[in-house]
Every structure is written in structure tokens, then in C-alpha cells.
From Swiss-Prot:
The keyword Transmembrane helix applies. This is Protoheme IX farnesyltransferase, mitochondrial. Its EC number is 2.5.1.141. Its main location: mitochondrion. The gene is COX10. Residues 1-60 form a transit peptide. It comes from Yarrowia lipolytica (strain CLIB 122 / E 150) (Yeast). It is found in: Mitochondrion membrane. Keywords: Heme biosynthesis, Membrane, Mitochondrion, Transferase, Transit peptide, Transmembrane, Transmembrane helix. It is a multi-pass membrane protein.
Amino acid sequence: MLLSNVAVNRTVVHTQLVSGSRSALHALSRTSHSVPVTHTHQRRHIFSHKRRLSSSTLAIPFALSNTNSATTAPLQFLSNVSLCRVTPGTITTSAKATAPNLDKMSAEAATTAAQASASPVEDSFLKKAVSCQSETEREAVMAARAAKKALRETKETWWAPYVALTKPRLTVLVVLSAMSSYALTPEAVSLTNLLFLTVGTALCSGSANAINMGREPAYDSMMTRTRGRPVVRGAVTPNQAFTFAGITGTVGTAALYFGVNPTVAILGASNIALYGGLYTTLKRKHIINTWVGAVVGAIPPLMGWAASGGSLLHPGAWCLAGLLYAWQFPHFNALSYSIRDEYKKAGYVMTAWKNPGLNARVGLRYALLMFPLCVGLSYYNVTDWWFVLDSSVLNAWMAWWAFKFWQQENVNIALAAAGKQYSQNPFARKLFWGSVVHLPGVLLLAMIHKKGQWDWLFGPSEDEKKKTLSS
């Protein structure tokens, strides 16, 4: 069905909508004039999640209603809302035709609503998408983007905010580090143990993250990176977040206790307390919070090692934990540097803005620590010696970016002391993405080079032969 000369009737601006997730409807046009569209386009349903804005395509939603329903609440027309697919050439022609009717739209209101409803990535994309448009076109695009976001959120399933409470990407990383450690132990692997370890670790991680979000909505709302979190936007209340955390934490700890062993359950429960309690509290008090957070990241490898029946006194277990602990600093210090002004505004005490020189120096120090830790894994027979060679490539890559980050930060500090202007450290972003690639790569190499992994193909090593003969 083709659309031609589509008219937009006045939509009522709502200050609060069901579940608090439709706030972006504020950005819809407040004018009662009609907006003619001079081109015909294929009708698209507004709730299509597959349709994305791109640099070559702009989507404009129009609320279709008859002339007798101008005063009806906008939610009544959700079933009639459509998307028109417009090319850059078309939007220019259309905007010129509609300029007289759009002059009453508040660009400031549209921008505010769009930013409030969009995620950090979407905020950045929106700015790029409209950077080359005229003021009138920017108003139309930003209003359209905000409305599209709000209407998509009305289709959000009831459980989606609770999944978001667990910080899925962070939880996946935590689970993978525990599973990697489990796979690297010299003990026999049990699929049942691995299943309970995976589920229990994921639930404990989700519980800790939910507590963290439930405690910080007022501060998270001040940061672009966190303003889209479910508690901030009202999808769930803090009490609901705490209830969810209690349930997942209890079930997760029980799964670890009965499905794995009590040692792993204690480690899982301690991680909830450290992250949801101590770390979250220290974030607004002292820079030592980063070191506490690194301890939280080092516990999952110990959980994986203990889950297989391995002794926590084994040096190899602590080398694995050390890898995760050391990795936190180049990773997080680079991340926090890029958004240090927002951390400061929100009241989070981070090294990135309290002491930028220390921030870069600590990142470099722990990046270099990766080399001896990887040697330790081979020395204590967790991996073969080829791992030292392979892992050195990734370690050197991350250490290089950490060095450049530290070097440039020293230059910036000197320029600031001399009263001269300096630019953002460009190596922070490179170090951050380098660390994202580094950790999975090192863990994968460790599993490939696990001691005795290839004995079936190449035969046992001389050390293994001596052990066999001596026994």
C-alpha cells in the first residue's frame, strides 16, 4: 500500500507513559498543522526492529488518524503508526515543502527527548546522521528518531528489563572466564558440574549487577553510558531490582552449592557482596574502588578451578586469577579516561579524573604484568611452553597501546602544567579495544595449549614420561 500526502494531526505530549518507557513521544510535533509529503513510499510498520536508520536512509514516523480524533491520546493510534522510507534526496525536497509547518517545533525539546530515550550508541549515531542536515531537517529527524524509539519500547517484553539488569555482556565475560579456568584444570571434566557452574555463575553475576543498578539510578542518569539502564528509565523500580537480585543470588548460590561444591558457592556469594556492596559504595568515595573491582573480576577463574576439584593452593589457579585481575586495569582505565568528565559530574571517584597520570601508569604496569603471568601458567604445567610464545604477541600488542596511552598522557600533563591546550588522548580508545580482543584471545590460546592437550597426536612430553616412570 502506497502513501501519498500523509497528514499528521496534533499529538498530545505526555509527561509519563506506561512503564516509563515511552517518554520519547515528547519529541513528536506539537503543531496542529498538517505535513504534506510529496513523494510516495512503501508503508512500514513502526514496530519493525529490523529497520535501522543509516547514513543513506532516514525514517519518519507519522501518526495516522482521521479528522475527528485530533484530541484523542496518541496511544490510541499506535496500531496506525507507520514508517515512510525516505532517501536523502527525498528528505530535502520534503523538508522544503514542510518547512512552514515545522517552524513551530522546538528543536531543543526534540533533541532532549531523543537523547533521553536513546542509548549511548544511538545518541552518537543520531548526531552523525543529522550533522549535515539543515536546522529544519534536523528537527524532523530527531523528532522521528525519538518517536520511533519510544514506540519500539512499547513493544518491549516484560522480561527484557530484567535481562538488562544482569548486564548480559559483562555476565557472559564472567561466565567465560570461569568456564575457561574449569577447562584448564588438570582434573577430569564433568558436563554436569560445568552446567551447574555456568548457570550458578551467571545468576550470581546477574544478582551483583542488579544490586549495582538498583543503588545508583540517580547517578547513572547523569551519564550517557548508563542513562539507558532499566532502573534509570523507570522500566523497573529499585525495589524490583533488589528483589530480582535476591532471587537470582539465592538460586545461583544454591546451584553452585548443591551442583558443584561449597567452596565455589562461597566464592560466588562473596562476589555478590564485593561488587554489589563494597565496590558500589567505594565508587563514590575513593579511587581504590578500581582495585576492589579487579578482585571481583579475578574470582570467577578461582570458581572454575575449584569447580573441577582442583586445589586453590595450586599456583596455576592464582596465575589465572592474576590474568583477570591485571587485565581489568588497562581495560577499565582506558574506558574511564574517555568518559572521565561524566564520571566526575556524576560524583564517581575515578583515577581517570582524580589523577590522570596515575591512571595511565597503572594501566601500563598491569599490561606488562601479563608477560610473567603467562610464563607462570606454563611453568606450573597448566599450559605447554608454546603458550608463552603465542600469548606474547597479544600481550605485546596490548602493552604497546598501554605504553602509548601513558606516553601521551605525560605529554598532556606537561602541556597542562605550562598552561597550553592539549587534545584528548587518542590512545585510550585503542587501548580499550585492544584489551577487548586481548582477554578472549589469551584464554583461547591457553585452552589450545593446555598441558597434555595434544599428547594423543604428538605423544607425551619428556616430563610426562618421567612422571609416568617414577609413579
